[in-house]
Amino acid sequence: QASYRCRMAYNGKTYQDVISLIDKTDNYQADVDSTAGDVFKNGIGSTFLICRLWQNGKEVDALKSTTYSVSAPTAPSAGAFYYKAAANSHTTTLMRYSGSAWTDVSSSAEYGHTKKYTWYRRDKNGEPLDNGAAFATGKVISINGDDVDVKTVFVCEVE
């Protein structure tokens, strides 16, 4: 974005204003999807939140898999992916099957996601939780009833 001050003289009077130019050719739209809805009853429930990124109607940095699990899929084919959840972390790990073993490829330039995803939370009044610090990172995160108090809004920032 660029802003310019413009001045113009007309009939002996000077007018000025500021014009802002914004490059809209690279606009992105981020959507947050949930694998298990958006309601937790009495603090019970769990889900994976997925940040899907769109540009000009096409998905950018797409999901590598729709499998989200604590344990690896059985009988995978070489090149298969899944998002591994850890019991003690909200962040998932992108795993790829090499043909003989599962490998963490979250940071891989070849297989990992091209964008950086940072998640934040806000309470029922719109106030930042976690002292404004990031709640989790990654395209896919896992949450449960302990992460929600009455109402919590999850926001994903994409870079």
Positions of PLM-derived features:
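Surface-exposed receptor/substrate recognition regions of extracellular proteins
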Residues: 1-159
